[in-house]
From Swiss-Prot:
One of its GO terms (biological process) is fusion of virus membrane with host plasma membrane. Residues 7-127 are annotated as: Esterase domain 1. This is Hemagglutinin-esterase. GO terms for cellular component: host cell plasma membrane; membrane; viral envelope; virion membrane. Its main location: virion. Disulfide bonds join C44-C65, C113-C162, C197-C276, C205-C249, C307-C312, C347-C371. Residues 414-424 are intravirion. Glycans are attached at N54, N89, N153, N236, N301, N316, N358. The active site is at S40, D326, H329. It is a single-pass type I membrane protein. Keywords: Disulfide bond, Glycoprotein, Hemagglutinin, Host cell membrane, Host membrane, Hydrolase, Membrane, Signal, Transmembrane, Transmembrane helix, Viral envelope protein, Virion. The chain crosses the membrane at residues 393-413.
């Protein structure tokens, strides 16, 4: 208890001199082992190809363009490349992973498989997809997209009926009905294989509703069977609705192996692309920056829904996106968020990134890294610091020893002085 006045005095001195070390609203990294996935707002190659060269197009600081730590493509996103013919092979590796993409598949694009479809289902798909990606990249270093080879023994070819605007679905592939089959009540199969990666994220999708064709209604049914382990993954249509439904996707995490895609009704689907996950690492939360349009266009919050603690930290600006190149490119708030990539930081938390690991006036929530020893402020002037008890105990012991030494020395000199006076 005798340490408490000194303890509070130290905290008061820190507060007096203004060393508050607050969390900052940025994405950053502990060291040089990081990687960013993005779109045009961090696509240095897109900027280089514009004439004249204009870095105001980006939210990323141009000093990072030659870092080799960025995989970005103007007009694209990982979700868009995963499902559609508009493809870019996002590839990167790092201990600390940052995502700043997703805006290129939003309600603004209004995608739905058919004219009677539902874009809300695709927003749900987007959220489920990024949930798996963020969770897995907290424990894997490497992400890339790979093709999935498959063998279908029939003569029918994949159909491109699931399309809207410039977007054409090609993952999963939708195998058309064989010419000699009269309706959609038939069983169809295709072999596919996964090899070369530690794990894969693959789509398993169905039309969850009554699909009408030639006055008959069909219930979709799709399965993937692992021929090596005997495990089966499946979805069956459960809804009775006949309009307003669309392609519901689940995103399975599968091991390498030989698989059989099976359809018992409607059309056969088989994955053609997968997220390839490699090199397991010590759990390190990913960081996600909100990816949205200027308010003149409709955006969604699916990356925020997917980014949940403890595997993900979400960063956002409090204001509308207003770019300086155009309204959708070069926003000051998001440029500020990405500026944290210019330097190392020791601690990530729910509130933000801490620049220093000694003390702070804010207690880090869901901290990760070497975080400051601090707690909340109970008054505007006096932070109450909570330290590791070991240094406090050692300090107490040292102070106690110092007091004993001082007392002994005082007694010694008092006795010695008395003896001298006696002999004098």
């Amino acid at each position: 208890m005798f340490l408490l006045p000194r303890f509070c005095l130290v905290c008061s001195i820190i507060g007096t001199f203004g060393f508050e070390n607050p969390p900052t609203n940025v994405v950053s990294h502990f060291n040089d082992d990081w990687f960013l996935f993005g779109d045009s707002r961090s696509d240095c190659n897109h900027v280089v190809n514009t004439n004249p060269r204009n870095y105001s197009y980006m939210d990323l600081n141009p000093a990072l363009c030659d870092s080799g730590k960025i995989s970005s493509k103007a007009g694209n996103s990982i979700f868009r490349s995963f499902h559609f013919t508009d493809f870019y092979n996002y590839t990167g590796e790092g201990q600390q992973i940052i995502f700043y993409e997703g805006v290129n598949f939003t309600p603004y694009h209004a995608f739905k498989c058919t004219s009677a479809g539902n874009n809300d289902i695709w927003m749900q798909n987007k959220g489920l997809f990024y949930t798996q990606v963020y969770k897995k990249m907290a424990v894997y270093r490497s992400l890339t997209l790979v093709n999935v080879p498959y063998v279908y023994n029939g003569s029918a070819q994949p159909t491109a009926f699931c399309k809207s605007g410039s977007l054409i679905l090609n993952n999963p592939a939708y195998i058309a009905r064989e010419a000699n089959v009269g309706d959609y009540y038939y069983k169809s199969e295709a072999d596919f294989s996964l090899s070369g990666c530690d794990e894969y994220i693959v789509p398993l999708c169905i039309f969850n509703g009554k699909f009408l064709s030639n006055t008959k209604y069909y219930d979709d049914s799709q399965y993937y069977f692992n021929k090596d382990t005997g495990v089966i993954y499946g979805l069956n249509s459960t809804e009775t609705i006949t309009t307003g439904f669309d392609f519901n996707c689940h995103y399975l995490v599968l091991p390498s192996g030989n698989y059989l895609a099976i359809s018992n009704e409607l059309l056969l689907t088989v994955p053609t692309k997968a997220i390839c996950l490699n090199k397991r690492k010590v759990f390190t939360p990913v960081q996600v920056v909100d990816s949205r349009w200027n308010n003149a266009r409709q955006s969604d919050n699916m990356t925020a829904v997917a980014c949940q603690l403890p595997y993900c930290y979400f960063r956002n600006s409090t204001s509308n996106y207003v770019g300086i190149h155009d309204v959708n490119h070069g926003d000051a708030g998001f440029t500020s968020i990405l500026s944290g990539l210019l330097y190392d930081s020791p601690c990530f938390s729910q509130q933000g990134v801490f620049r220093y690991d000694n003390v702070s006036t804010v207690w880090p929530l869901f901290p990760f890294g070497n975080c400051p020893t601090a707690a909340s402020i109970i008054s505007s002037d006096l932070p109450i610091c909570v330290y590791d008890p070991l240094p406090i105990i050692l300090l107490g012991i040292l102070l106690g020893v110092a007091v004993i030494v001082i007392v002994v020395l005082l007694l010694y000199f008092m006795v010695d002085n008395g003896i001298r006076q006696h002999y004098a």
